[in-house]
Amino acid sequence: MKSVLAIFSILTLTSVVALGGDPASKEVVIGISDAFVPGGFDSDTDAYVVVSGMFPNSCYRWKKADIAHVDTFEHEITSIAQVSQGMCLMVLVPFTRDIQLGRLDTGKHILRFKGGDGTFLEKTLIVE
């Protein structure tokens, strides 16, 4: 019985290695729950925001934030997660990330955080 179990274990491990080891993954747009916009930025400092939200399960991992500068004072931020296939814990997983916006011109900036379902969260950033 032990030898059958040992052979089964070896075959299972070998098949995982032969298949590449990593399950398939894809990128998806995720929505955020809130965005904290600190104050005190000037045109000589790099501006940033802190976003937070919930992943639907443990297969989601933060990947990146795509920033589109629509014009000088309007910016659209899209949060991207990587979802891997496989066994996942079906629990909400909180996340918090800093998003670097770079140096911005003096004035009132509109930040639009786009979600995957067409909705967005809008915040204002004042650069002195």
Say what each PLM segment does.
Residues 83-87, 116-123:
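Short acidic/polar inter-strand loop motif in beta-rich domains
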Residues 46, 106-108:
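Extracellular Ig-like/FN3 beta-sandwich strand-entry sites
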Residues 71, 103-105, 117:
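Short loop/turn positions at the edges of beta-strands in beta-sheet-rich folds
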Residues 19-70, 75, 119-128:
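Primarily secretory-pathway and cell-envelope proteins
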Residues 109-113:
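A short tyrosine-centered beta-strand micro-motif
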Residues 78-103:
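An anionic, turn-rich surface loop/hairpin at beta-sheet edges
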Residues 4-14:
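Sec-dependent N-terminal signal peptides
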